[in-house]
C-alpha cells in the first residue's frame, strides 16, 4: 500500500499513524491543484461576491470621507463599519479574516491588528491601509487598498503612484501558458525598483471559494513557486 503525504504540511502525530508496512511518498497534494481551478459555478459566485463587496465598500468609503473630519474615526471603528456595510449584502456569512486597518505607521506592519488597548485615531492627514474581506455563501473576497484621508507629502504621493502602476501591470498582464506567479511578480515591483523602493511581502495569493481566504498552491511573490497560473485560478492582486 502507498500513502501520499505533503511533508511540509503534515504533523508528526498524523504521520506516525501510517502503518509501517505502507510506502510513504512525499508529494504536493493533488487535491490542492484541483481545488484551485474553479468551475463555472464557482467563478460566477466569485463575481457575484465581488459585486456585493464593491457595493459595501462604496458605502464604506462615503462614510469614511464624511466621518474622518469629525475626529471620531479610529482603526477599530473602521473595522466595525466595514462589517456593518458588508452584513447588509445578500448571502453574507462573515469576515473572511480579521480586518487590518492600519493608520500611518501601523499600515506598514504586516498583519497588523488594532486592539482596544492599542489603536490609533484616524486624523484628516496621511494614509490609511485597509486589508479586509468577506465570506459570502457564493464566494470569498480579499481586498487591500490604501486610502488618502487627508494631505499627503510628495514622497508619499510618489510611492503611492508607483504601487498603483504595479497593481495595473498585474491586473492587465497578458502572459503565455506555463507562466508562474514569481515571473509576474516583477511587474508589480518594477516602478518601485526603478525608484529604489521595495516591499518584502508577497503580491498575491490564491483564494478559496467560501473556504480559506489564503489558498494554494499558486501565488504571486518573489520566492520561486513551480506552480503555473492556470485558467480558473482566483488570485489576489494586493
What do these predicted regions represent?
Residues 1-238:
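Active-site neighborhoods and metal-handling regions in enzymes and metal-associated proteins
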Amino acid at each position: 500500500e502507498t500513502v501520499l503525504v505533503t511533508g511540509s504540511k503534515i504533523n508528526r502525530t498524523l504521520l506516525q499513524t501510517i502503518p509501517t508496512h505502507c510506502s510513504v511518498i512525499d508529494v504536493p497534494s493533488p487535491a490542492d491543484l484541483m481545488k484551485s481551478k474553479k468551475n463555472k459555478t464557482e467563478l460566477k459566485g466569485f463575481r457575484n461576491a465581488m459585486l456585493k463587496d464593491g457595493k459595501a465598500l462604496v458605502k464604506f468609503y462615503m462614510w469614511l470621507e464624511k466621518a474622518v473630519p469629525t475626529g471620531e474615526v479610529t482603526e477599530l471603528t473602521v473595522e466595525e463599519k466595514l462589517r456593518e456595510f458588508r452584513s447588509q449584502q445578500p448571502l453574507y456569512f462573515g469576515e473572511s479574516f480579521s480586518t487590518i486597518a492600519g493608520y500611518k505607521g501601523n499600515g506598514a506592519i504586516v498583519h497588523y491588528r488594532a486592539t482596544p488597548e492599542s489603536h490609533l485615531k484616524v486624523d484628516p492627514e496621511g494614509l490609511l491601509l485597509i486589508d479586509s474581506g468577506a465570506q459570502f455563501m457564493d464566494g470569498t473576497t480579499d481586498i487591500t487598498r490604501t486610502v488618502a484621508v487627508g494631505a499627503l507629502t510628495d514622497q508619499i504621493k510618489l510611492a503611492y503612484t508607483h504601487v498603483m502602476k504595479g497593481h495595473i501591470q498585474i491586473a492587465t498582464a497578458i502572459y503565455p501558458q506555463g507562466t508562474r506567479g514569481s515571473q509576474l511578480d516583477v511587474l508589480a515591483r518594477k516602478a518601485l525598483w526603478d525608484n529604489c523602493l521595495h516591499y518584502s511581502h508577497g503580491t498575491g495569493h490564491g483564494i478559496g471559494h467560501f473556504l480559506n481566504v489564503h489558498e494554494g498552491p499558486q501565488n504571486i511573490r518573489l520566492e520561486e513557486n513551480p506552480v503555473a497560473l492556470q485558467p480558473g485560478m482566483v488570485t489576489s492582486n494586493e
